[in-house]
Amino acid sequence: MRLPTEKEPTTWRISEDWDQRLVIQLESSRKTKKLFIFDMDSTLIYQEVIELIASYADIEDKVAEITTRAMNGELDFNQSLAERVLLLKGIDASSIWDELKLKIQVTNGVPELCKALKKLNIIMGVCSGGFIPLAEFLKEKLGLDYAFANTLGIDDSNRLNGTTVGPIVNGEKKAELLLDIAKKHKIDPSDAVAVGDGANDLKMMFVAGFGIAWNAKPKVQKQAPACLNTKSLSDILYIMGYNDKEIKELID
C-alpha cells in the first residue's frame, strides 16, 4: 500500500499481485468538485495532434518518437516541443486546421462526462501542450469554459515556420492556469480535478485536489495521485461517487 503524501491528502492507490487498483477518497470530498481541467491529446481526444500535422510531411514516425519520450518524462517538454515543431516547418497551414477538425476522434465517454459536469455546474477547461485552434474547437464542441494551448508560427506564405508564438503551455504553465482559473472563480484548489496522460500533466495533478492519470504512460502512472485505465472517460463519474442511476440522470 502506498500511503498518502502531503501532496495527496485524500487519495492513494492499492496495487496487488492480481493487478487490481482502487482509488480511495474521503467521502466528504467526492461530490464537492467545482473545477475540471483536462489535457487534450490522448485524453479528450485519442490522437496526438502534432503527429497528425506531421503526417502532412510524412514525418509522423520521427515526431511520434520524440512525443513518446517527452510524455514519459525522458525529455524536457519545451525542448521536445521545439524539436518537433521545427520538423513541421514548411507545411501548408492554409487549410490544415479545418482538415484536422474532421480527423480528430473524441475519446469515448468525453461528451457524456462533459454533459454531466455541465449539469453539476462544474467549470471545465482544456490546458494542452498541443495547439490552440483545436483546443478552441473542442471547447465549443464540448461546452468547456476555457481553452489554453500553444500557437504555431506562420510565415508570409501561410506555411508553418517551425516556431511557436507566445508562452509555452508546459507542465508548469498547466498548473499555473489551473490555479488561476480556480482563483478567478473563488474555487479552492482542493475542489479541482486534473486529468491527463503525460509527464507534463503531473504538476497540475498535484496542485489539484484530485489528479487522474488517464490510460497514462507507465512512468506517469507510477507518479500520479490516481490512475484510471478503462475504455470510457465518463468512468470518472463513478470515482466522484455517482451510481448508475445518478449518472444516467446526469447524461440523459
Label each region the model flagged.
Residues 1-8, 13-152, 231:
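Alpha-helical substrate-recognition element adjacent to the catalytic core
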Residues 12, 98-252:
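C-terminal cap/substrate-recognition subdomain and adjoining C-terminal extension
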